[in-house]
Amino acid sequence: MIDRYKHQQLRIGSVSPQQISAWATKILPNGEIVGEVTKPYTFHYKTNKPEKMDYFVKNFGPIKSGICACGNYRVIGDEKEDPKFCEQCGVEFVDSRIRRYQMGYIKLACPVTHVWYLKRLPSYIANLLDKPLKELEGLVYCDFSFARPITKKPTFLRLRGLFEYEIQSWKYSIPLFFTTQGFDTFRNREISTGAGAIREQLADLDLRIIIENSLVEWEELGEEGHTGNEWEDRKVGRRKDFLVRRVELAKHFIRTNIEPEWMVLCLLPVLPPELRPIIQIDGGKLMSSDINELYRRVIYRNNTLTDLLTTSRSTPGELVMCQEKLVQEAVDTLLDNGIRGQPMRDGHNKVYKSFSDVIEGKEGRFRETLLGKRVDYSGRSVIVVGPSLSLHRCGLPREIAIELFQTFVIRGLIRQHLASNIGVAKSKIREKEPIVWEILQEVMQGHPVLLNRAPTLHRLGIQAFQPVLVEGRAICLHPLVCKGFNADFDGDQMAVHVPLSLEAQVEARLLMFSHMNLLSPAIGDPISVPTQDMLIGLYVLTSGNHRGICVNRYNPCNRRNYQNQKRSDNSHYKYTKEPFFSNSYDAIGAYRQKRINLDSPLWLRWRLDQRVIASRETPIEVHYESLGTFYEIYGHYLIVRSLKKQILFIYIRTTVGHIALYREIEEAIQGFSRAYSSGT
């Protein structure tokens, strides 16, 4: 069993037959070595108990803790109890949880290629051997034979490479000159077929020589350059890509200490029984996992092949080859049903679920049980936009918040002597008393939460936020953090988690808060940038007059867009005078009172220390007043001067939308300046 405290990662790869045997072999207290599964029986149809020496009991431990297959009971861990196993059925008196991790193995009568390495694209076996996949498939499934180049020995057949077994005349004429046993010896020495031929070729490979030869060939192809023939250039490009993949694959085998011949199986691991259970349903019927039926099929065919090879010496070679092909197909179906075409079905025309079907996909063992399993102190809901939230805050619905922080609220009620025990505190929470929400607010103030949106493809897929209570049942999120999550507000769901330990809370505050992750970890570009709805909002907010006062004064066609209203009695336009405001608060107040629109042009008094005057710009108009003051009107601003031509006031021509955007930017800059000054 994997110790979760000692092992922090899981790696899947090829292993040697010796390692498979070490995992599955177990020595009983009487010295008997068990682990190999030889019989295909499961449960007896009368007693509903496992058959002895099958792949359900003796090799894997008792079904119930301390109870053997005979029904005898022993106390687990008691030193006085003797013996430690049942002498009749051979079952050891141990905890039944051993059946979740105790493996077995099937000793195959012939080598069998692992279908993942042969049929999956790209084919690792084809890449290493540098041979077409179709030829290798014909060799594995006994459609072709391989003539062995035996060195330092005379060869009777002058054959090299692959040839079709069925069309050779030698198999009819040569046996006339040999005895049956002599012909079998000759054939086994010079002719090879099936997965054994693949295993021999893989075992003869030198990975370092493969890397050197592939690099040399790649350089030679690169020196040739373009031939001018598009077809030849594509062929060379595909060959170069293949050589790169072959080098990377060989380096991976060297780096992970994996031998290529391990892709051909000699021992087939048998899963622990609890991972392929047989359960009893109503009516006394048994329901079995599909993998049990597929294992049973492998054992039947393997035992038949063993009998043909050991007990019947006069068995024709064609029959042995046919049975080897059946064993190969049975193992293929067990590992990946349907990968070679038509999948295997049961009597009800239902496709059997193979090992690949059990582990792959959204409902597979990894994504559903190990990675996507539900955990405590977590929730899930739809996300909606929260434009009024700060960047580091998220809106948490009351219904979710009270469930996530319930234990903290109970502790707060008891500490403040508002509840005498846990039961009373839970009663107050169920009744939703006002004091509960007050304590919940206090608890949430100092406790961050983690928001995660699947799939988590990079570290910004999970970030920390300071939660605030909101009405409704949806999680509110600031729109600027959506790009890191790759989220939008069209029905996306996000999970919320509560970090419990002090270390997790510190990590969330120092590393995972959203305002601490403003740059992309991959390329360093800003990731908290306006997108989608925010860009449209900014456009609407600043979509006032960009062409100055001349558009409104001298272009009658555009007057309707700038508060020029059409009279109902004639076809003339009435020009509404653009209002003047002394500060931005008055302008926003007028907008809230609906005296002006969001994009209505207005004149806003500007500070004298922030000049907007262009040195070479000349005024469009100059208005003089009776007291000697005069107005210089430019395209986007207006200057009020005294009699001595001193600047009294400066007005800029803007809109309420521009004012609101400027105030937000100004407040953000001031907040950053205060934070920087306090930090230094």
Swiss-Prot record:
EC number: 2.7.7.6
Catalysis performed (reactions): RNA(n) + a ribonucleoside 5'-triphosphate = RNA(n+1) + diphosphate
Keyword Magnesium: yes
Taxonomy, superkingdom: Eukaryota
Chief location: plastid
Gene Ontology biological process terms, A to Z: DNA-templated transcription
Name this protein carries in UniProt: DNA-directed RNA polymerase subunit beta'
